Swiss-Prot record:
Name used for this protein in its record: COP9 signalosome complex subunit 5
Main localization, broad class: cytoplasm
MF-aspect GO terms: enzyme binding; macrophage migration inhibitory factor binding; metal ion binding; metal-dependent deubiquitinase activity; transcription coactivator activity
Lineage, highest ranks first: Eukaryota, Metazoa, Chordata, Craniata, Vertebrata
Organism field: Mus musculus
Segments carrying motif JAMM motif: 138-151
GO CC terms, sorted: chromatin; COP9 signalosome; cytoplasm; cytosol; nucleoplasm; perinuclear region of cytoplasm; synaptic vesicle; transcription regulator complex
Free-text comment about domains: The JAMM motif is essential for the protease activity of the CSN complex resulting in deneddylation of cullins. It constitutes the catalytic center of the complex.
Miscellaneous comment in the UniProt entry for this protein: The CSN complex is associated with some 'Lys-63'-specific deubiquitination. Such activity is however not mediated by the core CSN complex but by the BRCC3/BRCC36 component of the BRISC complex.
InterPro entries noted in UniProt: CSN5_C, JAMM/MPN+_dom, JAMM_MPN+_peptidase_M67A, MPN
Amino acid sequence: MAASGSGMAQKTWELANNMQEAQSIDEIYKYDKKQQQEILAAKPWTKDHHYFKYCKISALALLKMVMHARSGGNLEVMGLMLGKVDGETMIIMDSFALPVEGTETRVNAQAAAYEYMAAYIENAKQVGRLENAIGWYHSHPGYGCWLSGIDVSTQMLNQQFQEPFVAVVIDPTRTISAGKVNLGAFRTYPKGYKPPDEGPSEYQTIPLNKIEDFGVHCKQYYALEVSYFKSSLDRKLLELLWNKYWVNTLSSSSLLTNADYTTGQVFDLSEKLEQSEAQLGRGSFMLGLETHDRKSEDKLAKATRDSCKTTIEAIHGLMSQVIKDKLFNQINVA
């Protein structure tokens, strides 16, 4: 019974995150030093600022990053990723946490973190992990996956001196709320570069107090298409992890775990609606009503989408609780 429940929980998680199994463990883990040196010497990303289009993350690297992000609670955490490059794809093989000071809005790396980083990479090479640092990750607890002004500056600096490099952002709070990993991978454009107009990106809820920071810098970077993979070794390790932790799925509730997050979402939504109402009220006394109305209606439409998202997540959490109650608390004894 426990084994079947564990297997079902693992398959559900893998399907939700579109986890793909690598055809051969040697194929994905083989490190060709000569090939990597040739890529570094050619530097194709300098000729095309949109060169890297894909980001592949191993299942265990993903779990390590998400667990680290979740352990930080409402504080941001930071770590480094090891990997390699394969054409237009950046492959993240492993990750490790950094000893940094975190706040609710930023992470600050001190000298000790840089020393730890250098020592970790050196020791990893001694045990046969030849991959180099390929990026950094940090968390945005409760406010989505995007790059703030500080993140953009940090990533620009990394791309200037440590190419190839990618920035990954994880939202552990929304991951629990939605039941699917909320993660984004990004690369910045060089200073002064004006990117071509692109189609609308996937919509995500941005808190009112973060909208300005998001809007000012959103054209300075682009998102990579993220996918996840697992090898046969990953599969065995994941099975061991699921055998230990799958019961948490039944014993926990997103309604209780994320109660503060849901309350914050409702409060943020009320502020957005009040702001839109005030702008619509002023619009009747202004000239050029069409442009003003369109902006106000756009804000109302976004507030509606945010409301629907919060409602759906709450309903899913409630449905999960009802199903568990029916299964375990209302068994009719014949």
